[in-house]
């Protein structure tokens, strides 16, 4: 087995461990979201959404790229068996995150009135004061996640996610039913985040203590922090620019999307965002696990492996994420109606538009930044962020002022493309690596055909929404599979690679191999 195939196995195993955590936590959260949205109504749900997101402006300054640095260096040191450096990296990152988390939480609490006025809703000042704690809890959760990812212990991350989802759902529903309204929802959200953060740190500690002790070694907190800041600061500068851009979007929304109609639109937007997790189920594990994978490789010594790993990541991620995205876009309306009936009537349109950016997986959007950061070229992030900001500020003003939430979504789609394209040019020049464009085109074409046929069939049948949803999923999967075989998107080499990857997935190996056998027979018929 090649080195690329071995890395693919490890990455797939970590992705599956993260996937089950995402699925369970999201199902729990989705059930909670349905009840919470119904209990609060679209206006109060919109206020709840604003309150818990308001401190993001200050949270942007907490990380300074430290969490990305933790993942990168822990993965690198683990592959080099430098265990003491792993300990120094995790502990240094935690100290840095906690220190800034506490400081920024206090600042956010103090300036909560300013934030409330900035969002055009001064009455939610107490809610923003409560939600300011999310900055500190975010430090705990993100540090634990970075450590789990670097050591590829994603089952621990899944435990943390499930704890957060279960506590959040139970607490918010209970507090709202007890009559605490929007304030109860915010308290439930923050309490769950705190419990999840403490759980994550406890699991990180057990993982930390399990690392073998190295004789005559000591922790080097200050020097390690300097190394991580040198690596992570450019990422943070980019993140801060993105943060200001996001807050500018929010500011425009508060000016042009106002009143009861505006709050309802924000509520619809929030519901649509919750449905997008159907796509992130599959996109997030790939996005998360590729940074440690690329961090283990040396572009000079492992050039061919680097190329293979990148192309595998793009192609196989696209084979999953692109069709799932197409399903969500095609069946957005019956999906929303099935759960909310006639409520949240704008959500299907918002959901379909929000899904578009995940189609860029076929262009390498989930892998390219991880390749660049994994190889240490973090300063490139600043160039991408500046380009995005230069386009985003004027474009958002034009689109949001005229089209509200739709303008916001279109802006977020458009501004991401230039950065993606210059990133692809960079990796081509720097590493001689590129996307396998023909495969990506075939995947997009197969998904488009399946979407069109599924949509037309549902339009003709005009059945109740739950039946349309069920039939639509079955028809789409069938058509996409046939089209993938006919267009030769999958070949025998791909089948072999996928089978090797699947064989590392334990209990999932047998059912997945049955599916692979069926696809293999279809491929043999065409070839």
Predicted regions and their residues:
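N-terminal membrane topogenesis motif
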Residues: 1-29, 83-84, 88-92, 218-238, ...
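Transmembrane helical elements of multi-pass membrane transporters/channels
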Residues: 14-29, 164, 188-196, 200, ...
């Amino acid at each position: 087995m090649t080195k690329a195939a071995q890395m693919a196995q490890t990455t797939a195993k970590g992705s599956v461990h993260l996937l089950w955590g995402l699925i369970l936590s999201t199902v729990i959260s989705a059930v909670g979201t349905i009840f919470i949205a119904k209990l609060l109504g679209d206006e109060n749900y919109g206020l709840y959404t604003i309150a818990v997101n308001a401190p993001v402006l200050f949270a942007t300054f907490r990380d300074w790229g430290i969490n990305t640095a933790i993942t990168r260096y822990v993965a690198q040191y683990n592959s080099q068996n430098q265990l003491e450096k792993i300990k120094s990296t995790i502990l240094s990152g935690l100290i840095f995150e906690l220190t800034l988390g506490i400081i920024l939480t206090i600042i956010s609490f103090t300036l909560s009135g300013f934030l409330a006025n900035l969002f055009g809703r001064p009455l939610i000042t107490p809610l923003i004061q409560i939600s300011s704690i999310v900055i500190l809890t975010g430090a705990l959760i993100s540090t634990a996640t970075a450590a789990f990812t670097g050591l590829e212990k994603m089952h621990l991350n899944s435990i943390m996610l499930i704890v957060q989802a279960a506590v959040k759902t139970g607490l918010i529903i209970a507090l709202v039913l007890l009559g605490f309204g929007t304030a109860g929802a915010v308290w439930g959200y923050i309490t769950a985040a705190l419990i999840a953060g403490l759980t994550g740190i406890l699991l990180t500690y057990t993982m930390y203590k399990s690392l073998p002790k190295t004789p005559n070694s000591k922790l080097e907190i200050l020097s390690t922090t300097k190394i991580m800041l040198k690596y992570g600061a450019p990422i943070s500068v980019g993140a801060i620019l993105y943060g200001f851009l996001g807050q500018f979007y929010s500011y425009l929304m508060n000016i042009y999307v106002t009143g009861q109609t505006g709050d309802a639109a924000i509520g619809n937007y929030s519901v649509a965002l919750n449905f997008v997790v159907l796509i992130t189920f599959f996109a997030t594990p790939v996005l998360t696990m590729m940074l440690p994978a690329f961090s283990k490789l040396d572009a000079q010594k492992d050039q061919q492996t680097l190329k293979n790993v990148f192309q595998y990541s793009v192609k196989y991620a696209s084979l999953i994420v692109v069709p799932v995205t197409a399903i969500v876009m095609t069946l957005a309306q019956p999906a929303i109606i099935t759960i909310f009936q006639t409520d949240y009537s704008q959500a299907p349109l918002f959901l379909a538009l929000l899904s578009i950016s995940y189609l860029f997986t076929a262009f390498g959007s989930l892998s390219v930044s991880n390749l660049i950061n994994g190889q240490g070229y973090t300063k490139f992030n600043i160039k991408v962020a500046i380009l995005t900001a230069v386009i985003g500020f004027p474009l958002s003003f034009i689109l949001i002022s005229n089209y509200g939430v739709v303008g916001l979504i279109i802006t977020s789609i458009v501004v991401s493309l230039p950065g993606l394209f210059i990133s692809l040019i960079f990796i081509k020049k720097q590493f001689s690596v590129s996307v396998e464009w023909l495969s990506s085109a075939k995947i997009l074409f197969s998904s488009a055909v399946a979407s069109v046929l599924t949509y037309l069939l549902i339009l003709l049948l005009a059945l109740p929404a739950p039946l349309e949803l069920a039939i639509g999923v079955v028809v789409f999967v069938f058509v996409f599979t046939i089209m993938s075989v006919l267009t030769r998107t999958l070949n025998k080499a791909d089948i072999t690679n996928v089978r090797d990857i699947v064989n590392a997935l334990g209990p999932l190996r047998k059912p997945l191999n049955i599916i692979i056998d069926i696809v293999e027979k279809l491929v043999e018929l065409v070839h």
